[in-house]
């Protein structure tokens, strides 16, 4: 069955890899060859902005500005697509994706994880669009011009988007960019709900699970999931062990837990809210699905859990495709 995965961190990992590896074939979790083998319709490739000088050193990468980093990764992304144009092509919206599929090609969407690069200047948002970016995760795990992230501290969770952050959400809705609330504070999430409802646009939690099954602050509460569904949005099931297991320190990611989250999501807010956001190449631990070509293993588990073929199709690609169609230009 074909699928759309709304989040992987593969591009970041290439900053650490040798020049002999590419998006066509590599030693990590996501490449075009295995995407094709698994039946991928589309993959969202995130440009994750490393959080500080220490993280650059830990990753073995020479520090650079956010825009130097974005330029470098986006150039590699587009170069690898051009070099493999028989297999895959860039998509900036639903029509692009469907045209690619009709031509026998997979689609690649470009995203940015951490909206700090906007730096209180809307021109930077527009510049990212010109580079092909169609989804932005508003925050990562630190404060930025848009707002605050998820944390255990109640005061931070209760902090709203900044006034500029609210303008960013409005502008993204206008431009045809998908707003992503994974990593955002709880209060910031509700601001996005209000703005997107007003604008008649869906949004996503590209790689988040349910807090009621795995009590990590990165996950959504039941009420958040329902509100997300009401806007026509969806959440991508994250394969990280600590976001699936009741024990947030767990180190084993189990397909049965993914199915439990999907089932509860369906029962709480309807099947239309459930999608995929693997977070491959951005997560650690013992992963039952450790490669993009193994994603269909989840569909087999959903069938065992009682999901119909139509429901599995919605999780695999239909729900994400609907949001792409409704949000992206």
Residue ranges with predicted function:
Residues 2-5, 42, 89, 107-111, ...:
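Structural preference for beta-strand elements that scaffold enzyme active sites
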Residues 7, 35, 93, 132, ...:
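Conserved, mostly hydrophobic/aromatic
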Residues 18-37, 297-299:
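Short catalytic helix/loop segments, enriched in acidic residues and glycine
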Residues 29, 34-122, 141-143, 150-166, ...:
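A metal-dependent hydrolase metal-coordination microenvironment
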Residues 59-67, 149-167, 175-178, 209-221, ...:
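Glycine-rich tight-turn/loop motif centered on a GG-T
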Residues 120-130, 134, 152-178, 183-204, ...:
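Histidine/acidic residue-rich metal-binding segments in metalloenzymes
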Residues 238-239, 269-292:
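Short acidic/histidine-rich active-site segments
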Residues 290-329:
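Mid-to-C-terminal alpha-helical segments outside catalytic/metal-binding sites
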């Amino acid at each position: 069955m074909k699928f759309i995965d709304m989040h992987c961190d593969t591009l970041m990992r290439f900053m650490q890899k040798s020049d002999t590896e590419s998006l066509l074939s590599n030693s990590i979790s996501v490449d075009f060859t295995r995407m094709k083998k698994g039946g991928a319709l589309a993959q969202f490739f995130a440009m994750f902005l490393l959080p500080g000088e220490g993280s650059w050193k830990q990753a073995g990468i020479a520090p650079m500005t956010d825009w130097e980093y974005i330029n470098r990764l986006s150039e590699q992304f587009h170069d690898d697509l051009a070099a493999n144009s028989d297999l895959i092509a860039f998509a900036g919206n639903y029509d692009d994706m469907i045209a690619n599929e009709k031509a026998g090609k997979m689609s690649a969407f470009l995203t940015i994880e951490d909206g700090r690069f906007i730096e209180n200047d809307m021109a930077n948002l527009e510049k990212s669009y010109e580079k092909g970016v169609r989804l932005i995760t508003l925050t990562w795990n630190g404060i930025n011009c848009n707002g605050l992230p998820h944390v255990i501290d109640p005061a931070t969770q209760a902090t709203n988007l900044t006034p500029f952050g609210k303008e960013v959400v409005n502008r993204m809705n206008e431009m045809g960019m998908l707003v992503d609330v994974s990593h955002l504070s709880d209060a910031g999430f509700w601001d996005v709900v209000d703005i997107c409802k007003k604008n008649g646009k869906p949004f996503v939690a590209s790689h988040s699970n349910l807090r009621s099954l795995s009590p990590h602050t990165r996950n959504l509460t039941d009420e958040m999931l329902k509100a997300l569904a009401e806007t026509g949005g969806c959440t991508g099931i994250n394969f990280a062990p600590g976001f699936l297991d009741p024990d947030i320190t767990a180190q084993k990611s189990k397909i049965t837990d993914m199915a439990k989250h999907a089932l509860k999501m369906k029962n709480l807010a309807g099947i239309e809210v459930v999608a995929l956001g693997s977070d491959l190449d951005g997560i650690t631990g013992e992963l039952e699905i450790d490669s993009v070509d193994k994603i269909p293993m989840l569909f087999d588990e959903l069938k065992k859990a009682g999901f119909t073929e139509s429901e599995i199709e919605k999780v695999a690609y239909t729900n994400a495709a609907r949001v792409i169609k409704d949000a992206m230009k």
